[in-house]
């Protein structure tokens, strides 16, 4: 095919879509360029046949940043890109979330999306370009897809309002970093962090983005009309109505009763029993029998319909609650003796053990990004072991889900952390999910806030998080507060809000269906605020503000500043001086180019000892001040006395005594300690001392 190029305006930016020149063997391939700042190659490949052994839709999204895009060579021994970075993993999830619900129900063919950043000026994040490219590549591929989607990033400033697709510099001054994606009629995904914005401001940002990215959707439609391949001839499998009717008539009441069992494991055990009974009754090869896999799938469909219908009919939820009630909370802090800060946060059958650890500036995470090397002094790691849901499973490194949940929890608390110059510690928070039945990422937000306050980190305000759900059936809908795992799985929306009593700090939304209105989002935010204030109230009864002192187990940090021309004196030749201080005091010292010094010691005494050594090296002789010094060298005309490290002054023979002195050695010996008064320091730094004037100076109170 001949190359097709489409150019359009998106806010202040010019976006170019191109297909037919690169990666022509993929089902769909689009090269997207935004303002000549960033170029991303997006390819989509769909398998022509489905794998019947897979009981799920095998969609995979891979976002990758090539270092050559920024004119760099990778570090490390092999000098090539390795496993995905955390940024790449998070962006892959960001692209996956809005496109997954748009593939038709029952479509099980494998689809792989690969987004490769091939050129960047390092001024803007390539994620929005990647999402636009994914939308366009799917639109031209012919793969069944109910798109296209649009995507936008939104910033907010109280004085200037909303800003579309800000660059990195503009984001630094913003109170909001939000990414929104959706179709022409619906918002499907929101990912954001904010500095205590109101619910109205957050909703306004979502609606602003949805309005602005209509330009993307229209452009992709026109692009697909010109360059698109024929849509696959794929038909959704017909519903097995006789099988569904058979399960409903024989087991419908029993399934409905099972969903009134409030304890998760007991409920699952009962549903497993019923599933086996249904398979035994209806699976087989004879007349009126069905394949076992079909029966299992139909049983799941009946479960899905039963729970949803009960909720919209106003019946109690699975665990007996109404739609607005938060599960019972149990909150403990200081649960681990030797850690710097810890909390155990339990909400119903979801539990997080969260630990905060303080370290030195050297413990900050070094990030090698396309924009260059950065240091991150705050880490939040989320672990989800299989025992938390009563299962055996793989143990190992963090998966995509754990990385995504950890980042969401981090967003929730990051805005409330003190600035680096106020609290120059590196902070690592680890959330161990010890029990899970829904909303473990929001339990991590609550636990992180508690553990940080327990550690003595001066938080601006406590933070809590809550997960909301939605069931929409026809004209009826129900917004659910504090959803269970089953409600998340069977519902139409996952809506997570973290914030303080004053405002929202993080909002994540994933919507599985079309038709979520502004009214529904408003109600979800209103219910989330009510629940958040309830949780914060209970948290504040346990610990309402940060402890005034750090844990005795935490390192002590002392900050000071010296003249820039003294830095080399502290470091010494080849680093000998600073190395000696660190070895002798068992403290670590970080010196910045502006003369700022941070001293970290495992104990307060160690840090103080190191500080005194630095002060001694950098101190200047003060005129009129008395020092106790040591005679270093005697000459005919006087004696050189060391009063500060590296600083000797001259006591002229005439200044040794009120009496006439014939020989200096009659009065002083080398190594002798004496009191001296600083008389003068000339412009070359030479220090003039006196011994005979000390008594008079002491008498006058110097």
Curated annotation (Swiss-Prot):
Cofactor(s) this protein requires: Mg(2+)
EC number from the UniProt entry: 2.7.7.8
Residues that span the membrane, as ranges: none
Catalysed conversion reaction: RNA(n+1) + phosphate = RNA(n) + a ribonucleoside 5'-diphosphate
Gene Ontology MF terms in the entry: 3'-5'-RNA exonuclease activity; magnesium ion binding; polyribonucleotide nucleotidyltransferase activity; RNA binding
Keyword Transferase among UniProt keywords: yes
InterPro entries listed in its UniProt record: ExoRNase_PH_dom1, ExoRNase_PH_dom2, ExoRNase_PH_dom2_sf, KH_dom, KH_dom_type_1, KH_dom_type_1_sf, NA-bd_OB-fold, PNPase
GO biological process, one term: RNA processing
Record-annotated KH domain positions: 555-614
Keywords, alphabetical: Cytoplasm, Magnesium, Metal-binding, Nucleotidyltransferase, RNA-binding, Transferase
Short name of one Pfam family: RNase_PH_C
S1 motif domain boundaries: 624-692
Domain of life, source organism: Bacteria
Residue sites binding Mg(2+) per the record: 488, 494
Subcellular location: Cytoplasm
Cited SMART domains: KH, S1
Gene Ontology CC annotations of this record: cytosol
Family the UniProt entry places it in: Belongs to the polyribonucleotide nucleotidyltransferase family.
Function description: Involved in mRNA degradation. Catalyzes the phosphorolysis of single-stranded polyribonucleotides processively in the 3'- to 5'-direction.
Subunit text: Component of the RNA degradosome, which is a multiprotein complex involved in RNA processing and mRNA degradation.
Name of protein: Polyribonucleotide nucleotidyltransferase
Gene: pnp
